[in-house]
């Protein structure tokens, strides 16, 4: 299958300068990037084709060979492949074989264009949310420090009007090969640090980095039902790419703050409801809090501490859809404090009225002490 013209692939004229090439590549790379087109083989092929065209046309030597001889002038150079002379000067000899192996170990992996576009790094932002905001959904503003492309030099690293020069040490390859006896070891060029080019006049804004650091305020929409550990992805809001590569993404990771009343367990909420022994004994009606407001909870007579009551649909609606969870209310018996002498006397009278009566007033207590009595009797010889 014949290859398309590289200028046609990028949609530029043959006399386009590096800035125009980079601009065209950035637009097409973002359009066909695999992250934006998952499981799309056509887009993946387009992305590979665009990247290959950019790799050739941003390398002065390869572009010159391509302009003169077409694809025949650069076949075997674009897209990787460990070129160069082999052991004893022949192509594909022992030196190339061992160079590939040791290149992988020492940071090489074969000769490639050092100016090929590189995607920016992804960033993570930890966002603490109140439970109410996490359940209902909200919009928050966050401040994110990151690197962006330098506007002064358009990410080139060189002062506008100046040019980059081919590295005299690696001759534009970004790597140097060191012969160590029988083996050839490939290492990053110490002069250009793998760039393949040197900057004669660095950009006065970014000092040759091609990127500058800024802190940007972003508005993030938090969907209802988000939970601790959930991540919200903001495309292209990560670190700026290198050599015209697309930016990375920003992942906002949610963490729900502790709540004074409720504990969350997935889509369910839990809370403790204090109750006095009169209501627990005779029954009654209590007001309990929910995230939607107060509701009535009916307490049946003879309710024991620790009993759980379930309020259907008063929990959290899952972020990925589905019915809301429940609110689980655990009744906790509260012992009265700061009683007057008169109140204490009334309680003693009440206690006296229970003494000697049938054990059904305190079945658990009776069962417990009956068990203790039997335990010690069984221990007797």
Curated annotation (Swiss-Prot):
Belongs to the DnaJ family. This is Chaperone protein DnaJ. The J domain is necessary and sufficient to stimulate DnaK ATPase activity. Zinc center 1 plays an important role in the autonomous, DnaK-independent chaperone activity of DnaJ. Zinc center 2 is essential for interaction with DnaK and for DnaJ activity. It comes from Chromohalobacter salexigens (strain ATCC BAA-138 / DSM 3043 / CIP 106854 / NCIMB 13768 / 1H11). The keyword Cytoplasm applies. A zinc finger (CR-type) spans 137-215. NCBIfam families: DnaJ_bact (TIGR02349), PRK10767.1 (NF008035). Zn(2+) 2 binds at residues 167, 170, 189, 192. Keywords: Chaperone, Cytoplasm, DNA replication, Metal-binding, Repeat, Stress response, Zinc, Zinc-finger. Binds 2 Zn(2+) ions per monomer. Residues 5-70 form the J domain. Homodimer. It is found in: Cytoplasm. GO terms for biological process: chaperone cofactor-dependent protein refolding; DNA replication; protein refolding; response to heat. Participates actively in the response to hyperosmotic and heat shock by preventing the aggregation of stress-denatured proteins and by disaggregating proteins, also in an autonomous, DnaK-independent fashion. Unfolded proteins bind initially to DnaJ; upon interaction with the DnaJ-bound protein, DnaK hydrolyzes its bound ATP, resulting in the formation of a stable complex. GrpE releases ADP from DnaK; ATP binding to DnaK triggers the release of the substrate protein, thus completing the reaction cycle. HAMAP family: DnaJ. Its main location: cytoplasm. CXXCXGXG motif repeats lie at residues 150-157, 167-174, 189-196, 203-210. CDD domains: DnaJ, DnaJ_C, DnaJ_zf. One of its GO terms (molecular function) is zinc ion binding. One of its GO terms (cellular component) is cytoplasm. Zn(2+) 1 binds at residues 150, 153, 203, 206.
């Amino acid at each position: 299958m014949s290859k398309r013209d590289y200028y046609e692939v990028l949609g530029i004229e043959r006399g386009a300068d590096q800035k125009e090439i980079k601009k065209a590549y950035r637009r097409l790379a973002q359009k066909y990037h695999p992250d934006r087109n998952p499981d799309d083989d056509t887009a993946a092929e387009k992305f590979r084709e665009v990247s290959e065209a950019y790799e050739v046309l941003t390398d002065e030597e390869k572009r010159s060979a391509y302009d003169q001889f077409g694809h025949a002038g650069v076949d075997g150079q674009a897209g990787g492949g460990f070129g160069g002379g082999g052991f004893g000067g022949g192509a594909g000899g022992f030196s190339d074989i061992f160079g590939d192996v040791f290149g992988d170990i020492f940071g090489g992996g074969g000769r490639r264009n050092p100016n090929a576009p590189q995607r920016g790094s992804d960033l993570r932002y930890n966002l603490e949310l109140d439970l109410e905001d996490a359940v209902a959904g909200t919009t928050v503003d966050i401040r994110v420090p990151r690197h962006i492309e330098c506007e002064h030099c358009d990410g080139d690293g060189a002062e506008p009007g100046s040019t980059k020069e081919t590295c005299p040490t690696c001759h534009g390859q970004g790597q140097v090969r060191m012969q160590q006896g029988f083996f050839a070891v490939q290492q990053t060029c110490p002069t250009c640090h793998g760039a393949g080019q040197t900057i004669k006049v660095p950009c006065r804004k970014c000092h040759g980095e091609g990127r500058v650091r800024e802190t940007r305020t972003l508005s993030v929409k938090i969907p209802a039902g988000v939970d601790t550990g959930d991540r919200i992805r903001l495309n292209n809001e990560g670190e700026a790419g290198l050599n015209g590569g697309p930016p990375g993404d920003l992942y906002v990771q949610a963490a729900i703050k502790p709540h004074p009343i409720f504990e969350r367990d997935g889509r369910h909420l839990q809370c403790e409801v204090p109750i006095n022994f009169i209501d627990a004994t005779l029954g009654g009606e209590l007001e309990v809090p929910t995230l939607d407001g107060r509701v009535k909870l009916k307490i049946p007579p003879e309710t024991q501490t620790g009993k759980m009551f379930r309020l259907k649909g008063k929990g959290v609606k899952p972020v990925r859809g589905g019915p809301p969870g429940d609110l689980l209310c655990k009744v906790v018996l509260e012992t009265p404090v700061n009683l007057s002498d008169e109140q204490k006397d009334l309680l003693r009278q009440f206690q006296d009225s229970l003494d000697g009566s049938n054990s059904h007033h305190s079945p658990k207590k009776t069962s417990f002490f009956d068990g203790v009595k039997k335990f010690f009797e069984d221990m007797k010889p």
